[in-house]
Amino acid sequence: MGQCVTKCKNPSSTLGSKNGDRDPSNKSHSRRGAGHREEQVPPCGKPGGDILVNGTKKAEAATEACQLPTSSGDAGRESKSNAEESSLQRLEELFRRYKDEREDAILEEGMERFCNDLCVDPTEFRVLLLAWKFQAATMCKFTRKEFFDGCKAISADSIDGICARFPSLLTEAKQEDKFKDLYRFTFQFGLDSEEGQRSLHREIAIALWKLVFTQNNPPVLDQWLNFLTENPSGIKGISRDTWNMFLNFTQVIGPDLSNYSEDEAWPSLFDTFVEWEMERRKREGEGRGALSSGPEGLCPEEQT
């Protein structure tokens, strides 16, 4: 498991445009009087003399007015395009550092090196978050498209950039709607798509449930996982429906399971779990009662 992101730099460009002091199409008039006549300044810098206009020769003023201003929008788009191209180059270099020699993808060995450079364990929650953002289809593999799209999604194009995104990803995963999306992604992520799997192996499901609930461990989770662990023969796999409904189960059923009803539309495995757990608690309670009373109803301190 692992993932990357592209950090797109968009430096802003604030190029000003020059405006002439005068409209070059206007005529410059001198006052009419004895010995004076109206003088017209030809457009685009062909003056009739070196008369100053606001401290600038007419030739210079007219030429300056005829210059077309540079569009700040065009300059900004060009700057953004250059930044995106540079970011793609950095992503290409990063991807090549970990990709397989024969396949255009990061496989298990490259994933280990990638996680090592990120200073994370391949089995920890942060790597699952990267896989979620990369929308990885398979564990221990990032295709070129997944890697590039994922890096762009988190705006990172370097190891340092990806590491810097971890805190915000952890925060995002605490949002109810985002966690639901992550939770459902995790089921698909655990499947072996190349083999056409439609349900998770029991051991894989247990590991993924522990992983996805890293930040928010529901009270019933440990009981549920104990049930799955202690009943291996009766549970071959976990379907998508069971996986998805378990999240609802943790949200509406209390830790004492007292408000669970078999009449509601829960998967049959949940009925079996609740029955098993209630029996276990009953036996546990009876065992504690027997220890506290001792033989013949005597308290332990009264026994010899």
Curated annotation (Swiss-Prot):
<dbReference type="GO" id="GO:2000134">
    <property type="term" value="P:negative regulation of G1/S transition of mitotic cell cycle"/>
</dbReference>
<protein>
    <recommendedName>
        <fullName>DCN1-like protein 3</fullName>
    </recommendedName>
</protein>
<dbReference type="GO" id="GO:0005829">
    <property type="term" value="C:cytosol"/>
</dbReference>
<dbReference type="Pfam" id="PF03556">
    <property type="entry name" value="Cullin_binding"/>
</dbReference>
<feature type="region of interest" description="Disordered">
    <location>
        <begin position="1"/>
        <end position="86"/>
    </location>
</feature>
<feature type="lipid moiety-binding region" description="N-myristoyl glycine">
    <location>
        <position position="2"/>
    </location>
</feature>
<dbReference type="GO" id="GO:0097602">
    <property type="term" value="F:cullin family protein binding"/>
</dbReference>
<keyword id="KW-1003">Cell membrane</keyword>
<dbReference type="GO" id="GO:0032182">
    <property type="term" value="F:ubiquitin-like protein binding"/>
</dbReference>
<dbReference type="GO" id="GO:0005737">
    <property type="term" value="C:cytoplasm"/>
</dbReference>
<keyword id="KW-0449">Lipoprotein</keyword>
<dbReference type="GO" id="GO:0031624">
    <property type="term" value="F:ubiquitin conjugating enzyme binding"/>
</dbReference>
<feature type="domain" description="DCUN1">
    <location>
        <begin position="86"/>
        <end position="278"/>
    </location>
</feature>
<dbReference type="GO" id="GO:2000436">
    <property type="term" value="P:positive regulation of protein neddylation"/>
</dbReference>
<dbReference type="GO" id="GO:2000434">
    <property type="term" value="P:regulation of protein neddylation"/>
</dbReference>
<dbReference type="GO" id="GO:0005634">
    <property type="term" value="C:nucleus"/>
</dbReference>
<dbReference type="GO" id="GO:0045116">
    <property type="term" value="P:protein neddylation"/>
</dbReference>
<dbReference type="GO" id="GO:0043065">
    <property type="term" value="P:positive regulation of apoptotic process"/>
</dbReference>
<keyword id="KW-0472">Membrane</keyword>
<comment type="subunit">
    <text>Part of a complex containing DCUN1D3, CUL3 and RBX1. Interacts (via the DCUN1 domain) with the unneddylated cullins: interacts with CUL1, CUL2, CUL3, CUL4A, CUL4B and CUL5; these interactions promote the cullin neddylation and the identity of the cullin dictates the affinity of the interaction. Interacts preferentially with CUL3; this interaction triggers the relocalization of CUL3 to the cell membrane where CUL3 is neddylated. Interacts (via DCUN1 domain) with RBX1.</text>
</comment>
<dbReference type="InterPro" id="IPR014764">
    <property type="entry name" value="DCN-prot"/>
</dbReference>
<dbReference type="GO" id="GO:0005654">
    <property type="term" value="C:nucleoplasm"/>
</dbReference>
<dbReference type="GO" id="GO:0005886">
    <property type="term" value="C:plasma membrane"/>
</dbReference>
<dbReference type="GO" id="GO:0000151">
    <property type="term" value="C:ubiquitin ligase complex"/>
</dbReference>
<dbReference type="GO" id="GO:0030308">
    <property type="term" value="P:negative regulation of cell growth"/>
</dbReference>
<keyword id="KW-0539">Nucleus</keyword>
<dbReference type="GO" id="GO:2000435">
    <property type="term" value="P:negative regulation of protein neddylation"/>
</dbReference>
<dbReference type="GO" id="GO:0010225">
    <property type="term" value="P:response to UV-C"/>
</dbReference>
<dbReference type="GO" id="GO:0048471">
    <property type="term" value="C:perinuclear region of cytoplasm"/>
</dbReference>
<feature type="region of interest" description="Disordered">
    <location>
        <begin position="284"/>
        <end position="304"/>
    </location>
</feature>
<dbReference type="GO" id="GO:0010332">
    <property type="term" value="P:response to gamma radiation"/>
</dbReference>
<dbReference type="InterPro" id="IPR042460">
    <property type="entry name" value="DCN1-like_PONY"/>
</dbReference>
<keyword id="KW-0963">Cytoplasm</keyword>
<comment type="function">
    <text>Contributes to the neddylation of all cullins by transferring NEDD8 from N-terminally acetylated NEDD8-conjugating E2s enzyme to different cullin C-terminal domain-RBX complexes and may play a role in the cell cycle progression by regulating the SCF ubiquitin E3 ligase complex, after UV damage. At the cell membrane, can promote and as well inhibit cullins neddylation.</text>
</comment>
<dbReference type="GO" id="GO:0010564">
    <property type="term" value="P:regulation of cell cycle process"/>
</dbReference>
<keyword id="KW-0519">Myristate</keyword>
<dbReference type="InterPro" id="IPR005176">
    <property type="entry name" value="PONY_dom"/>
</dbReference>
